[in-house]
């Protein structure tokens, strides 16, 4: 598969075919005054002078220190990752269909699947989904197909699930006869009270969805909920932050028999924050369910000459083979993001991932402890969390967040829209990129803002 750039005569021929006189004409819908002009750079300057000039221009942009999490996280991305990803051999987001010409790309995906299966403790992984929310929706559909014992298409979900995931799940399953029951959140401890599950004991469920760490950063009672679900004939779908699995037990170890399907958002591993995407969703499962798994799966094989190679496998599940009977409409994967994640995990290794996760947890704990020393400010829950905590404030949280922006800090995620009991609460997140100085500046800015708005 060639990635050689087009020659001028090839470009001219293509433009002639579509009736365009130039490449600029293809973008004529963009007003001229909005188009980027030539950079104004002095002639004859050396690289150091050029770098200094561009740095001064870049400093005109104002960058707040970010303490927002809520599903998208600021982690350090080693420079080598995107330098490699941007190479012509990798720089495509599409699935490598032509196995004999795509061995390198297929091997990257195979390595990704191996790493994700190891991280989650599952037997198999697909090549990725669009994002964490769609990965959950596909996991629910997969569980319904796979659980032959269930007589209904009902799913039990803990309210502490990420609200965006829930909305996407409802949208995708809206016309498929799938029903959801919600186990209400205990606003006193930020997670599902396992005793409330008995209210649903007489209902037949195909699956139970558990997010841990949940949307509020709390670690769910995964053992109790998993055992309850299996006792009542339901499969367990685990939604998790892959970074947390570097220091927490894997979903395969939840309860007596472990989760059946694991999914989530892969953005924390080498993918930058970029106005909501592109990210990638991951999905792994036990071998018993692999034939119901949606999306691409890369397998290792041997050719006619006995040489080891890679190919797309179990394709009879997919739309281009089964049409309407396929496991899913998805016929691709987030290949470019997966490449970044694979290189990220390879560069850091198990010890590196553990360090990132541990420092993130330590910094979050330190930030919460320092904030709790201020009058009227408290960490809402006393449970163990990973890298996010809910902070109660003595003032309206939405106003507080707005005022903190003026101090150069994105203070956290306003929770009032999520739960009526949390109007004066924000969720803050710290990772390995936050320094002691960053945390100190957050505390000083909080003091200043609370004094200004009456806290």
Curated annotation (Swiss-Prot):
It comes from the Bacteria. Keywords: Oxidoreductase. Its EC number is 1.4.4.2. It catalyses: N(6)-[(R)-lipoyl]-L-lysyl-[glycine-cleavage complex H protein] + glycine + H(+) = N(6)-[(R)-S(8)-aminomethyldihydrolipoyl]-L-lysyl-[glycine-cleavage complex H protein] + CO2. CDD domains: GDC-P. GO terms for molecular function: glycine dehydrogenase (decarboxylating) activity. Transmembrane segments: none annotated. InterPro entries: GcvPA, GDC-P_N, GDC_P, PyrdxlP-dep_Trfase, PyrdxlP-dep_Trfase_major, PyrdxlP-dep_Trfase_small. It holds the Pfam family GDC-P. The glycine cleavage system is composed of four proteins: P, T, L and H. In this organism, the P 'protein' is a heterodimer of two subunits. Belongs to the GcvP family. N-terminal subunit subfamily. The glycine cleavage system catalyzes the degradation of glycine. The P protein binds the alpha-amino group of glycine through its pyridoxal phosphate cofactor; CO(2) is released and the remaining methylamine moiety is then transferred to the lipoamide cofactor of the H protein. This is Probable glycine dehydrogenase (decarboxylating) subunit 1. It comes from Francisella philomiragia subsp. philomiragia (strain ATCC 25017 / CCUG 19701 / FSC 153 / O#319-036). The gene is gcvPA.
């Amino acid at each position: 598969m060639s990635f050689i750039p087009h020659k001028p005569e090839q470009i001219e021929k293509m433009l002639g075919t579509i009736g365009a006189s130039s490449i600029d004409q293809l973008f004529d819908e963009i007003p001229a005054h909005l188009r980027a002009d030539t950079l104004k750079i002095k002639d004859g300057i050396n690289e150091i002078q050029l770098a200094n000039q561009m740095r001064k221009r870049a400093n005109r942009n104002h960058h707040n220190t970010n303490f927002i999490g809520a599903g998208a996280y600021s982690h350090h991305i080693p420079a080598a990752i995107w330098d490699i990803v941007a190479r012509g051999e990798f720089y495509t987001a599409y699935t490598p269909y032509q196995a004999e010409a795509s061995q390198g790309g297929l091997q990257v995906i195979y390595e990704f699947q191996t790493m994700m299966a190891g991280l989650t403790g599952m037997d198999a992984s697909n090549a990725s989904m669009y994002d964490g929310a769609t990965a959950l929706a596909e996991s629910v559909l997969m569980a319904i197909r796979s659980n032959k014992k269930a007589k209904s298409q009902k799913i039990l979900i803990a309210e502490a699930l990420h609200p965006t995931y829930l909305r996407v799940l409802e949208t995708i399953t809206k016309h498929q006869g799938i029903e959801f029951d919600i186990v209400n959140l205990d606003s006193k401890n930020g997670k599902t009270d396992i005793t409330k599950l008995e209210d649903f004991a007489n209902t037949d469920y195909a699956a139970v969805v558990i997010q841990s760490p949940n949307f509020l950063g709390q670690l769910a009672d995964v053992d109790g909920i998993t055992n309850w679900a299996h006792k009542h004939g339901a499969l367990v779908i685990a939604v998790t932050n892959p970074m947390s699995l570097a220091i927490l037990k894997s979903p395969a170890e939840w309860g007596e028999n472990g989760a059946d399907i694991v999914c989530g958002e892969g953005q924390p591993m080498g993918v930058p924050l970029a106005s909501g995407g592109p990210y990638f969703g991951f999905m792994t499962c036990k071998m018993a369910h692999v034939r119901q798994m949606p999306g691409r799966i890369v397998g290792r094989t041997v050719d006619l000459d006995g040489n080891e190679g890679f190919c797309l496998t179990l394709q009879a599940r997919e739309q281009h083979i089964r049409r309407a009977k396929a496991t899913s409409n998805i016929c691709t994967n987030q290949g470019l993001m997966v490449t970044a994640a694979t290189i990220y995990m390879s560069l850091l290794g198990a010890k590196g991932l553990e360090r990132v996760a541990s420092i993130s947890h330590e910094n979050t704990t330190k930030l919460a402890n320092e904030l709790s020393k201020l009058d009227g400010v408290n960490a809402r829950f006393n449970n163990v969390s990973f890298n996010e905590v809910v902070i109660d404030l003595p003032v309206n949280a939405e106003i507080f967040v707005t005022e903190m922006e003026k101090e150069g800090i994105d203070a956290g995620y306003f929770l009032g829209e999520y739960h009526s009991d949390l109007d004066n609460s924000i969720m803050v997140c710290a990772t390995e990129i936050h320094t002691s100085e960053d945390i100190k500046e957050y505390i000083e800015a909080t003091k200043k803002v609370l004094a200004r708005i009456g806290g």
